[in-house]
A protein has these predicted regions:
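Glycine-rich phosphate/diphosphate-binding loops that line cofactor/substrate pockets in enzymes
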Residues: 35-45, 86-92, 116, 174-179, ...
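Thiamine diphosphate
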Residues: 57-131, 133-140, 289-308, 335-337, 343-345, 434-513, ...
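Phosphate/pyrophosphate-binding active-site segments
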Residues: 10-27, 162, 198, 321, ...
Length: 620
């Protein structure tokens, strides 16, 4: 089955899944909606994020009778999709979201696309208009099946009530095996209302779908040989490591071979940030030393990655000096963006287990010496620039007191210190996302939940809710920008009503910061609708997030001065309830380093207009 494989159940050949042999007259008569909920219980579902409507209310009525499933009512379907996706990414099991037909289903689309791009197992169940009304432009009818074809792993339109048990069992299996992804199950209202004596299959048997792909012994030996011959190897790994629960195997591989490891943003946590072999992460805003190590590598071991443009930039120049080994469970990713010299389709956990039996260690002394020099010379760093000193933030909010400036990077550093790097961090999309990845030192997988491939603003706080539901024992903090936070601010109501103690730290610069940065770099600082404050009252911080939060009965406070920050963060972290901390920061700060789109590592901007002096290519 390809990554996208979609069929209406009425037109789909029956699978040959064995069925429990129970005489029909002995099986209880059940309504379709009750069968759906029973199937979810059978799959071990503990939480459903759902917003009811006319075409899905039968399912919600059935949920009220479930003793095993907690139903969380969000305040927008996009919020529920992000929450369910984050729940899945934190606990590793499929998240479930539920919406009605029409606008309810379309509001899920961004979350479904996000799960598809970032390979998260998501089950999106939608109500649909009754079967006789399909295709007749009925009230709240949309073709969610067709609409989501490019952004799902599989889709079902359930036209027969008897198919529900098989469909749901298949959906969970498909979503969580191979490369994880979202599955849509569209169920017409009259199917939910129909009755049958259901048969629950005891296992899934999908002909043509074989997610259990394994590396060959020949490939293992070839990779071991390449490592033996290499002088400058680098492991480049991504979210595939985390999805496969292969972080322990990756660390063992790195320590056995003594090969440095660079991750993508989606792979952050696959190896501890403070591990001696960690290069942190690479790409547009990644470390100088990770980017340059990949550029200089004579062997690139690409594990569970897709060579996306935010990592490779000018792809023809990416890792052009080295032999590329690409291992991924999804064959469609092999040679899609970058041709590999040794392509391998395999489950990465199994591949690493086999490699760990075959590889031998080397010292790579010269290589590690070079990397140590780059690390010492080019750490993540920031300073108070002239632009910050001249900013409205300093002039008006601080009355010129430069000792009280709050740099956004410092907020993340302090949060890392106070939580000892052990919090689950979710983000929206923008500058704050990059600073969170740069300055929070993640030690474990499934601790950074961000929107990577799709880059969806509004992701941060709903994701924090889903993460906190999945791990109520952990401190969960949504780091957001004022633009991104506003997009799903209504989920503060969900946090309060459902008693979900997820925190929010807003790096509030009154602008769309990342777009402003690009305006400064590439558009002569011409502002194209990136100011989020009140133009008629620029001296006011707008909106008043503290007042808004308190309107939802959520605790909140604003921080303007550096001396206020530590005690405010301590109060937030000590609170056993939802909490919003609105931190005012200057908008003139840029995320650095930065490789401009389509450029190379040699055109990386490090500080203001400084580019790295990384030497020539002698010895390559």
């Amino acid at each position: 089955m390809p990554r996208n494989s979609n069929t209406a159940v009425k037109n789909r050949p029956k699978t040959t899944a064995p069925k429990v042999e129970v005489a029909a007259e002995e099986r209880p008569l059940m309504r379709g909606a009750d069968i759906v909920i029973k199937c979810l219980e059978n799959e071990g579902v503990e939480v459903v994020f759902g917003y009811p409507g006319g075409a899905s209310m039968e399912l919600h009525q059935s949920l009220t009778r479930s003793k095993k499933i907690r139903t969380i009512l969000p305040r927008h379907e996009q919020g529920e999709a992000f929450a369910a996706e984050a729940y899945a990414r934190v606990c590793g099991r499929p998240g479930v979201c539920l919406a009605t037909s029409g606008p309810g289903a379309t509001n899920l689309v961004t979350g479904i696309a996000d799960a598809f791009m970032d390979s998260a197992p998501l089950i999106a169940i939608t109500g649909q208009v009754p079967r006789p009304m399909i295709g007749k432009s009925a009230f709240q009818e949309t073709d969610v099946f067709g609409m989501t074809l490019p952004i799902v792993k599989h889709s079902y339109l359930v036209m027969n009530v008897e198919d529900i048990p098989r469909v749901i069992q298949e959906a969970f299996y498909i979503a969580s095996t191979g490369r994880p992804g979202p599955v849509v199950i569209d169920i017409p209202k009259d199917v939910q209302q129909s009755s049958c004596r259901p048969v629950f299959p005891d296992k899934v048997n999908l002909r043509g779908y074989n997610p259990d792909k394994r590396i060959s012994d020949i490939a293992v030996n070839e990779i071991a040989g390449l490592i033996e011959k290499s002088e400058r190897p680098v492991v480049y790994c991504g979210g595939g490591i985390i999805s496969a629960n292969a972080s322990a195997e990756l660390r063992e591989f790195a320590e056995k071979t003594n090969i440095p490891v660079a991750t993508t943003i989606m792979g952050i946590g696959a190896i501890p940030a403070d591990h001696p072999l960690s290069l942190r992460w690479l790409g547009m805003h990644g470390t100088v030393y990770a980017n340059y190590a990949v550029d200089r590598a004579d062997l690139l071991l690409a594990f569970g990655v897709r060579f996306d443009d935010r990592v490779t930039s000018k792809v023809s120049e990416f890792a052009k000096h080295g032999t590329i080994v690409h291992i991924d469970v999804d064959p469609s990713e092999i040679n899609k963006n970058k041709v590999a010299h040794l392509p391998v389709v395999s489950d990465i956990k199994y591949a690493l287990q086999q490699l760990n039996k075959a590889v031998k260690g080397k010292k790579f002394e010269a290589w590690h010496k070079q990397i140590a020099e780059w690390k010492a010379k080019y750490p993540f760093r920031y300073r108070v620039t002239d632009e910050v000193l001249k900013s409205q933030y300093v002039r008006e909010f601080l009355r010129g007191d430069v000792n009280e400036i709050i740099m956004p990077q410092y907020v993340i550093e302090l949060l890392d210190e106070l939580t000892k790097g052990d919090a689950i961090i979710t983000t929206g999309v923008g500058q704050h996302q990059m600073w969170a990845a740069q300055y929070y030192k993640f030690k474990h997988p499934r601790m950074l939940i961000t929107s990577g491939g799709l880059g969806a603003m509004g992701h941060g706080y709903p994701a924090a809710l889903g993460a906190k539901v999945a791990r109520p024992d952990k401190q969960v903090i949504g780091i957001d920008g004022d633009g991104s936070f506003t997009m799903n601010i209504q989920e503060l109501a969900t946090a309060h009503i459902e008693r979900i103690a997820a925190k929010a730290v807003i790096l509030n610069n009154q602008h769309l910061g990342m777009v402003v940065q690009w305006e400064d770099r590439f558009y002569q600082s011409n502002r194209g609708h990136t100011y989020l404050g009140d133009p008629q009252n620029p001296h006011q911080i707008y909106p008043d997030f503290v007042a808004v939060a308190k309107g939802f009965n959520v605790a909140a406070e604003r921080v303007v001065r550096k001396s206020e920050l530590r005690p405010a963060l301590e109060r937030m972290l000590a609170a056993n309830e939802p909490y919003v901390l609105d931190v005012i920061v200057p908008y003139t700060e840029h995320v650095l380093p930065m490789i401009p789109a389509g450029k190379t590592v040699r055109e990386m901007i490090i500080e203001k207009d400084e580019t790295p002096n990384l030497g020539d290519n002698k010895g390559l």
